[in-house]
Amino acid sequence: MRFEKWQALGNDYVIVERDALPFELTPERVRALCAPHSGIGADGVLELAHVDEPGFVASLRVFNPDGSEAELSGNGAREAILYLRRAGWTDQEQFSIRTAAGELRPTILSDTTCRVDMGRARDEGTGEICGFAYQQVNVGNPQCSIRVTSEADLAALSLAELGPPIETDVRFPNRTNVSFWTELAPNRIRARIFERGVGETASSGTGACGAAVAHALRGGDSPVTVVLDGGELEVEVGDDLHIDLTGWAEPVYAGELSPELLSRLASLS
């Protein structure tokens, strides 16, 4: 079984084509693929499939390393989009892909960069959690965005301690992603991301979008540069909360699963 591993700002995914899979991707199999020592090792798996729908090049499913399926990944979407171009699924600069969160409309800017029309975010209100004021938004997946006062305060946070109780709070029945952010300038913010089913990550495209929307709702500029541990993303938030995400992604390597690993995966339910 052939696969490619891609990364975007340190957020790495295994990309597989459904037609090449000898079995269905189940939570156990996803966990085995993402295992760092006995599998490929990744932050998740992206499954691409052909669709018979005018204007659509593919459908995309996103799996977290714990085996759960996510509605969307901003970094994963860019990786999948650029993979589709490189693999010859399309030669168009603009096309659509289907996700659990709805239609994504990318524009290819270069071999390694694209802009993705992520659709409209939803303002889902504010509250207080773990001693922090938060803004809840949905950008295709749930995002709990928390503003802190300074870079020093942001750096001092232990996301390993704060992330799990926020992610699993009863107010978020499907669990939530969490972004902590601070304003560096009206058009520049710094963020740290705790992803649902993953933990703290070097970057997250949808996490960056969640922080950017929260920043915009507080009167911040758009577009805004979101500075993450893994690099920078540009997010444009319209007055109607319509989001465009721009950033890069690149292939790391391609390979074939060994017969031994394939046999082990096939034995899992």
What function would you assign to each model-found segment?
Residues 1-110, 145-269:
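A glycine-rich beta-to-alpha transition motif near the start of alpha/beta enzyme domains, typified by
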Residues 118-134, 159-161:
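Active-site glycine-rich loop that binds ribose-phosphate moieties when present
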Residues 120-122, 139-143, 249:
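Glycine-rich beta-alpha junction loops
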Residues 128-155:
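Internal active-site segments that recognize and position negatively charged phosphoryl groups
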